[in-house]
């Protein structure tokens, strides 16, 4: 399965919520009609079965983090092997992806931008260049940008926006050095309340 490169509003409308696929410069409601599913204008959202709800939640989270189906299932299997609530560990694994950490540190306005930054060898982890977006970042790791990446206008604009909005509690960023520390895996309370990971666990437990 290839990575989706079509209209991001279509995905957000499909799930009926913001998937944070846009830069956030303008409110998403001004771009996407989240209360209407994609398709004919008069089409309404139908009442879904339990399975449908579980599937939609899985698709929503998978698309939010930009992960393919096989990758997502592997994350679930790994989460089930680790100690702790499987749903919470699943989200922590997704949050620990290098592309997501770059996004959380404010070096990119979207996860897709962060993924591109990593793929183009613009990111260093503990002083070494890493071009694998799915790499798991460990607590204590230092993530920074190469000098060439620091000069990109979109990176500078993203970091300026992050300084205005603030950073998550689990990262510590030095904007002057274009680097930050991944302090710890985030607690569940620190993550989006709009994600119902228990539905994903129910789906994969069948």
Swiss-Prot record:
Any one of the GO CC terms: small ribosomal subunit
UniProt GO BP: ribosomal small subunit biogenesis; translation
Matches recorded under PROSITE patterns: RIBOSOMAL_S4 (PS00632), S4 (PS50889)
Residue stretches making up the S4 RNA-binding domain: 96-157
InterPro entries: Ribosomal_uS4 (IPR022801), Ribosomal_uS4_bac-type (IPR005709), Ribosomal_uS4_CS (IPR018079), Ribosomal_uS4_N (IPR001912), S4_RNA-bd (IPR002942), S4_RNA-bd_sf (IPR036986)
Domain of life: Bacteria
Keywords noted in UniProt: Ribonucleoprotein, Ribosomal protein, RNA-binding, rRNA-binding
GO molecular function, one term: structural constituent of ribosome
Keyword RNA-binding: yes
Gene3D superfamilies to which the protein is assigned, alphabetical: Ribosomal Protein S4 Delta 41, Chain A, domain 1 (1.10.1050.10), RNA-binding S4 domain (3.10.290.10)
One Pfam family of this chain: S4
Subunit field text: Part of the 30S ribosomal subunit. Contacts protein S5. The interaction surface between S4 and S5 is involved in control of translational fidelity.
Protein family per UniProt: Belongs to the universal ribosomal protein uS4 family.
Protein name (Swiss-Prot/TrEMBL): Small ribosomal subunit protein uS4
Originating organism: Alkalilimnicola ehrlichii (strain ATCC BAA-1101 / DSM 17681 / MLHE-1)
UniProt gene name: rpsD
